[in-house]
Every structure is written in structure tokens, then in C-alpha cells.
């Protein structure tokens, strides 16, 4: 049925291609806004697509969901701030986490250790 509908519309059957420029606009928005709350609606607006298409395209192009990408970038930023000597609470706030507990939970979930343990490993 899908092939017949595509043929009737004058389009070849198959999947549409991912919109790289839109996904890249969302990615750039993420990088510019890490210290602030970021919603999928904001990303969709920055990309110029609806949230469902953006989510599909983002995953297809970058291999992860927009939410996971934001979380990994925040963890990267928090680690840089911690390595630069910032207290954990300040690093959490600077990287856009709601509090130090949120940073710790996500850090353990992703890396298997607390940020404090990771910091001590850096200095040992």
C-alpha cells in the first residue's frame, strides 16, 4: 500500500533522508545552551522541524537521542569544570544540572563512579 501511495504521488518508495542542517542547528543550540534548561520544543524550534522529526533525524545522524546528547555534553562540561578545580556543586550548576545530586546520579549511571571519586583519581 505504501509503495502504491508513493507511486500515485509521483515519488519513489523508500525512506526520506534525514535533515542534517536541521539536526546540526539543534546540536549547535545544545552547545550554546548547556548551562540552561533545554527542552525538546526549544530544539525543534531551533532546528525548524517538529520534535518527532528532529528526534528521528538526530538519532539517525548522531547515533543518540537529543536528550542523551545533552546529558553527555553536560557531563563532559562538568568534568572539565571539576578538573579545573571547581567544587562539585559549582560544576553541576555550571554544566546545567539541577543540583549536585543530579550530576552525581548521571555520572554514576554513565561512568560507574561518583564525580568525587573521578576527581580524586585525576589527582592521584
Regions flagged by a language model, labelled:
Residues 1-31, 41-49, 53:
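An amphipathic alpha-helical interaction segment
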Residues 4-8, 61, 85:
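A short secondary-structure junction motif
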Residues 29-33, 80-84, 94:
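Short alpha-helical segment immediately N-terminal to, or the first helix within
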Residues 31, 37-73, 92-118:
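Basic/polar phosphate-binding segments, predominantly the helix-turn-helix DNA-binding elements
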Residues 33, 37, 85-86, 122:
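Short coil/turn helix-boundary motifs
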Amino acid at each position: 500500500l505504501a509503495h502504491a501511495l508513493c507511486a500515485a504521488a509521483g515519488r519513489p518508495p523508500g525512506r526520506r533522508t534525514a535533515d542534517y542542517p536541521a539536526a546540526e542547528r539543534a546540536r549547535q543550540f545544545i552547545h550554546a545552551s548547556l548551562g540552561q534548561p533545554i527542552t525538546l520544543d526549544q530544539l525543534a524550534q531551533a532546528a525548524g522541524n517538529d520534535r518527532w522529526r528532529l528526534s528521528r533525524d538526530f538519532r539517525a545522524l548522531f547515533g543518540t537521542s537529543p536528550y542523551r546528547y545533552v546529558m553527555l555534553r553536560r557531563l563532559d562540561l562538568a568534568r572539565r569544570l571539576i578538573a579545573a578545580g571547581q567544587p562539585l556543586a559549582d560544576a553541576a550548576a555550571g554544566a546545567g544540572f539541577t543540583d549536585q545530586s543530579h550530576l552525581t546520579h548521571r555520572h554514576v549511571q554513565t561512568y560507574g563512579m561518583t564525580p568525587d571519586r573521578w576527581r580524586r583519581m585525576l589527582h592521584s
